[in-house]
């Protein structure tokens, strides 16, 4: 009898657990089709499942996401009027309590499980996809390549200077030993044994890059891409997925981009413009400065201050020298933080924020009236912002591209 009772109790427990699992599945696992109403007009029907960012992209609505949907950039904002569940802790570092009450969400964090009613920025309806062809992919510095893409014939990417595109990469495996690196840069690659790395990616990825080209350079998109190698203190960490993929591209390869996106745009004023950059932060600096001078024929006073380690890390030198010769309202300066003996450098040395202060802003009659545009490594951005705050520059005159470096 006890054996029979035990079997019955065991069976009951199994049935209860099975029912609990089925109930949980009905609540947690997405099934069937759902409808998403966009901006009170467009209705999208799609299978439930996945994140809202990807679901919208599949329907041709591309929400900007500099981090590729990782939840770290905070740019893929939409307003969820109904559906979507509760806001997640990962979103609250980017969304204020007031914004959360108004329905603001990060689309990369919203699960597509039920019918939803959402609002997206109107400008995203102007975003498109293009399959581009690699024209060239050349080293401009030890760890920076210039990727030049040809837009399909008859097409145009209607971007503004300072804007960015998103680039897609399929699943891939990339070995650093196969990279085409000019010999002049081998010293550092050998020193840090960078040839050892392999980047293996098992699913499609998406990342954002600021454009180095400006709107009048028709038919092409230019990017400056820094290779994201593991930090020396954590050599076993995986290398950057997208930068590794981009560095492997060769002329003739096909690449899918979407855009344009952006908010790092120049103000339409007569104020002096001070551009401060470093590393791959060169990209939006070049785009802005060329646009102001070559397309707009701006008469504003424009200075450009760029920080690099050594002469080997300087690029677009001839381009900016030519601009300075052609436009009397433009000057540019480079500061090397660690010049090599063979550089025979007699220019500015040190960190760029100190050089800008000592040689331009220290005795400037009204630095608070200038507009400052910057893009570079995080520590450079932080140092420049502190220096500007100490000078009394208001936030509205400090414009930062914080993912282009």
From Swiss-Prot:
Region (Catalytic): 270-387
Sequence ranges assigned to domain 2Fe-2S ferredoxin-type in this UniProt record: 32-124
Keyword Iron found: yes
Domain FAD-binding FR-type: 127-267
Gene name per UniProt: nqrF
EC numbers: 7.2.1.1
Positions contributing to [2Fe-2S] cluster binding: 67, 73, 76, 108
Protein name: Na(+)-translocating NADH-quinone reductase subunit F
Enzyme class, spelled out: translocase
Manner of cofactor binding, per the entry note: Binds 1 [2Fe-2S] cluster.
Organism: Neisseria meningitidis serogroup B (strain ATCC BAA-335 / MC58)
């Amino acid at each position: 009898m006890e054996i029979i009772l035990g079997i019955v109790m065991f069976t009951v427990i199994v049935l209860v657990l099975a029912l609990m699992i089925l109930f949980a599945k009905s609540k947690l696992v997405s099934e069937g089709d759902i409808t998403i109403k966009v901006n009170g007009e467009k209705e999208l029907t799609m299978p439930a499942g996945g994140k809202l960012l990807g679901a919208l992209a599949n329907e041709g609505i591309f929400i900007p996401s500099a981090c590729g949907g990782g939840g770290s950039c905070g740019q893929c904002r939409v307003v969820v009027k109904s559906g979507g569940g509760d806001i997640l802790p990962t979103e609250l570092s980017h969304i204020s309590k007031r914004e959360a009450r108004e329905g603001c969400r990060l689309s990369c964090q919203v699960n597509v499980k039920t019918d939803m009613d959402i609002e997206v920025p109107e400008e995203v309806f102007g975003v498109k996809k293009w399959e581009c062809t690699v024209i060239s992919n050349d080293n401009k510095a030890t760890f920076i390549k210039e990727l030049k893409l040809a837009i399909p014939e008859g097409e145009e990417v209607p971007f503004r200077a300072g804007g960015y595109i998103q680039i897609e990469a399929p699943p891939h495996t990339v070995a650093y030993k196969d990279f085409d690196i000019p010999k002049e840069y081998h010293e550092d690659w050998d020193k840090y044994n960078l040839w050892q790395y392999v980047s293996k990616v098992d699913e499609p990825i998406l990342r954002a890059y600021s454009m180095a080209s400006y709107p009048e350079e028709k038919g092409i998109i230019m990017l400056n891409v820094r290779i994201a190698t593991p930090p020396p203190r954590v050599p076993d960490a995986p290398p950057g997925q997208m930068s590794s993929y981009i560095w492997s591209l060769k002329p003739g390869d096909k690449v899918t981009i979407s855009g344009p996106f952006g908010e790092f745009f120049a103000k339409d004023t007569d104020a002096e413009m001070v551009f401060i950059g470093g590393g791959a932060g060169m990209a939006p600096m070049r785009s802005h400065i060329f646009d102001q001078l070559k397309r707009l024929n701006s008469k504003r006073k424009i200075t450009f201050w760029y920080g690099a380690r050594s002469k080997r890390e300087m690029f677009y030198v001839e381009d900016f020298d030519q601009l300075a010769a052609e436009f009397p309202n433009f000057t540019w300066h480079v500061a090397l933080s660690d010049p090599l003996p063979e550089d025979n450098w007699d220019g500015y040395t040190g960190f760029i924020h100190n050089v800008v202060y000592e040689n331009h802003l220290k005795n400037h009659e009204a630095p608070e009236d200038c507009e400052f545009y910057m893009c570079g490594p995080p520590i450079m951005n932080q140092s420049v912002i502190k220096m500007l705050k100490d000078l009394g520059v208001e936030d509205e005159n400090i414009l930062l591209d914080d993912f282009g470096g």
